UniProtKB/Swiss-Prot annotation:
NDH-1 shuttles electrons from NADH, via FMN and iron-sulfur (Fe-S) centers, to quinones in the respiratory chain. The immediate electron acceptor for the enzyme in this species is believed to be ubiquinone. Couples the redox reaction to proton translocation (for every two electrons transferred, four hydrogen ions are translocated across the cytoplasmic membrane), and thus conserves the redox energy in a proton gradient. It comes from Aeromonas salmonicida (strain A449). Belongs to the complex I subunit 4L family. The gene is nuoK. This is NADH-quinone oxidoreductase subunit K. It comes from the Bacteria. InterPro entries: NADH_UbQ_OxRdtase_chain4L/K, NUOK/Mnh_C1-like. Its main location: membrane. It catalyses: a quinone + NADH + 5 H(+)(in) = a quinol + NAD(+) + 4 H(+)(out). The lineage of its organism: Bacteria, Pseudomonadati, Pseudomonadota, Gammaproteobacteria, Aeromonadales. GO terms for molecular function: NADH:ubiquinone reductase (non-electrogenic) activity; quinone binding.
Length: 102
Protein backbone atom coordinates (compact mmCIF):
# COMPACT_ATOMS: atom_id res chain seq x y z
CA UNK A 1 0.00 0.00 0.00
CA UNK A 2 1.16 3.49 -0.79
CA UNK A 3 -0.80 5.43 1.85
CA UNK A 4 -2.55 8.65 1.05
CA UNK A 5 -2.02 10.30 -2.32
CA UNK A 6 0.17 13.38 -2.38
CA UNK A 7 -2.66 15.54 -3.74
CA UNK A 8 -4.85 14.80 -0.73
CA UNK A 9 -2.13 15.72 1.74
CA UNK A 10 -1.31 18.94 -0.09
CA UNK A 11 -5.01 19.80 -0.36
CA UNK A 12 -5.37 19.33 3.39
CA UNK A 13 -2.31 21.52 3.97
CA UNK A 14 -3.75 24.22 1.69
CA UNK A 15 -7.12 24.12 3.47
CA UNK A 16 -5.45 24.39 6.88
CA UNK A 17 -3.30 27.27 5.65
CA UNK A 18 -6.38 29.12 4.34
CA UNK A 19 -8.19 28.58 7.65
CA UNK A 20 -5.21 30.02 9.50
CA UNK A 21 -4.96 32.96 7.09
CA UNK A 22 -8.66 33.76 7.49
CA UNK A 23 -8.29 33.63 11.26
CA UNK A 24 -5.28 35.92 11.06
CA UNK A 25 -7.11 38.50 8.95
CA UNK A 26 -10.49 38.37 10.68
CA UNK A 27 -9.79 38.00 14.39
CA UNK A 28 -8.55 40.90 16.54
CA UNK A 29 -7.85 38.98 19.73
CA UNK A 30 -4.12 38.37 20.16
CA UNK A 31 -4.63 34.81 21.43
CA UNK A 32 -6.61 33.85 18.32
CA UNK A 33 -4.04 35.54 16.10
CA UNK A 34 -1.30 33.41 17.68
CA UNK A 35 -3.42 30.29 17.21
CA UNK A 36 -3.96 31.16 13.54
CA UNK A 37 -0.23 31.57 13.00
CA UNK A 38 0.33 28.16 14.62
CA UNK A 39 -2.24 26.60 12.26
CA UNK A 40 -0.46 28.15 9.28
CA UNK A 41 2.92 26.87 10.44
CA UNK A 42 1.55 23.37 10.98
CA UNK A 43 0.02 23.43 7.50
CA UNK A 44 3.38 24.28 5.97
CA UNK A 45 5.02 21.53 8.02
CA UNK A 46 2.42 19.06 6.73
CA UNK A 47 3.19 20.11 3.16
CA UNK A 48 6.90 19.49 3.75
CA UNK A 49 6.26 16.02 5.17
CA UNK A 50 3.89 15.06 2.35
CA UNK A 51 6.30 16.25 -0.32
CA UNK A 52 9.22 14.51 1.36
CA UNK A 53 7.36 11.23 1.62
CA UNK A 54 6.36 11.38 -2.04
CA UNK A 55 9.97 11.21 -3.19
CA UNK A 56 11.19 9.13 -0.23
CA UNK A 57 13.52 11.88 0.96
CA UNK A 58 14.25 12.83 4.55
CA UNK A 59 14.31 16.54 3.69
CA UNK A 60 10.61 16.92 4.48
CA UNK A 61 11.08 15.52 7.95
CA UNK A 62 14.09 17.75 8.56
CA UNK A 63 12.06 20.80 7.54
CA UNK A 64 9.25 19.58 9.81
CA UNK A 65 11.63 19.61 12.78
CA UNK A 66 12.75 23.13 11.83
CA UNK A 67 9.16 24.39 11.52
CA UNK A 68 8.16 22.83 14.84
CA UNK A 69 11.14 24.43 16.61
CA UNK A 70 10.27 27.80 15.07
CA UNK A 71 6.66 27.34 16.14
CA UNK A 72 7.75 26.62 19.71
CA UNK A 73 9.90 29.76 19.78
CA UNK A 74 7.08 31.82 18.27
CA UNK A 75 4.60 30.46 20.80
CA UNK A 76 6.81 31.25 23.79
CA UNK A 77 7.55 34.80 22.62
CA UNK A 78 3.93 35.35 21.61
CA UNK A 79 2.59 34.18 24.96
CA UNK A 80 5.08 36.39 26.79
CA UNK A 81 3.87 39.37 24.75
CA UNK A 82 0.28 38.34 25.41
CA UNK A 83 0.87 38.36 29.18
CA UNK A 84 2.62 41.72 29.01
CA UNK A 85 -0.18 43.20 26.92
CA UNK A 86 -2.86 41.93 29.28
CA UNK A 87 -1.04 43.15 32.40
CA UNK A 88 -0.51 46.61 30.97
CA UNK A 89 -3.78 47.29 29.11
CA UNK A 90 -6.18 44.68 30.60
CA UNK A 91 -7.28 43.66 27.10
CA UNK A 92 -6.14 41.33 24.34
CA UNK A 93 -7.72 43.32 21.52
CA UNK A 94 -5.02 44.47 19.11
CA UNK A 95 -7.04 47.45 17.82
CA UNK A 96 -7.68 48.81 21.32
CA UNK A 97 -3.99 48.72 22.16
CA UNK A 98 -3.03 50.52 18.95
CA UNK A 99 -5.62 53.24 19.68
CA UNK A 100 -4.32 53.70 23.23
CA UNK A 101 -0.89 54.58 21.94
CA UNK A 102 -2.02 58.02 20.81
Amino acid sequence: MNGIPMEHGLLLAAILFCIGLCGLLIRRNLLFILMSIEIMMNASALAFVVAGSRWAQADGQIMYILVISLAAAEASIGLALLLLLYRRYHTLNVDTVSEMRG
